[in-house]
């Protein structure tokens, strides 16, 4: 998938225009750097997110008000065996929420309030997550 074209299409939607939700892209992550990050963190990212990172390291929206995809060096791997058998990856945020990737057998995206602890299901896939962001639902 060409993520830039997909996201530009999302910014042209009626809701994105009404909410002035724009997008800024970054240079791609080199595959060797991404593989090194995965090995260091003992995580293999879902193909959908890997393919995005290989096209753009981050995604800024609303002129810095939202970061649907933080630059890779700002991602946090959260390991809490009491809460989840698999690690979570904090990869995006807005002023009110942090976005977490569940790395279990069915990777999904959850969100939690920035100053809260209860996560809630947000999207089943990365592309659905981006659709919700650009509809102003993040």
Regions found by a protein language model. Name each.
Residues 107-114:
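Intrinsically disordered, low-complexity regulatory segments enriched in Ser/Thr/Pro
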Residues 1-105, 137:
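A surface-exposed partner-binding patch
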Residues 116-135:
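Compact, glycine/acidic-enriched structural inserts
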């Amino acid at each position: 998938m060409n993520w830039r074209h997909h996201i530009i299409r999302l910014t042209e939607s009626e809701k994105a225009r009404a909410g002035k939700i724009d997008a800024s892209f970054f240079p791609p992550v080199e595959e060797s750097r991404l593989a090194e990050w995965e090995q260091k963190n003992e995580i293999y990212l879902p193909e959908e997110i890997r393919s995005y990172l290989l096209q753009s390291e981050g995604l800024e929206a609303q002129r810095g008000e939202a970061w649907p995809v933080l630059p890779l060096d700002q991602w946090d791997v959260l390991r809490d065996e009491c809460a989840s058998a698999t690690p979570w990856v904090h990869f995006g945020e807005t002023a009110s929420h942090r976005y977490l990737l569940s790395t279990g057998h069915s990777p999904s995206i959850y969100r939690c309030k920035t100053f809260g602890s209860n996560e809630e299901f947000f999207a089943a896939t990365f592309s659905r997550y981006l659709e919700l962001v650009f509809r102003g639902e993040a």
